[in-house]
Amino acid sequence: MHGPIGTKLALAIVIAMAFAGCGRQERQVKFASDVKPVLDRACLDCHEDGKAGYEASGLSVASYDELMTGTRFGPVVLPGDPESSVLVQLIEGRADPSIKMPHGSESLYQGEIETIRLWVSQGAPNN
């Protein structure tokens, strides 16, 4: 690669490689605007103080703090670890089928599942 054509080609390759990594950035998932509305729609009917899901497990999704407290059996969200987070396992159908969530309702939309999974992988921030 000598001469002006070789130099231009090398420069074009370097520029293309630099922009290849910039084209697709992972979106930042926000608890308040992305996750909480899904939990309110699909989970809050059962998982709030005094309701069946809460009575059975101790899990309330009424607030960030209550969600992060988890159940009387342990946490359901492990920040940064969606594979081990019980919440993600349940909504993806990877747990015991008898406790599929939402219980007795249709599954979450794939986009909603991906949003919750991404939020957990981003550290499950209260944002």
Annotate each language-model stretch with its function:
Residues 1-6:
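N-terminal secretory signal peptides that target proteins for export/translocation
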Residues 8-18:
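Bacterial N-terminal signal peptides
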Residues 22-127:
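Aromatic- and Gly/Pro-enriched helix-to-coil junctions and flexible linker segments
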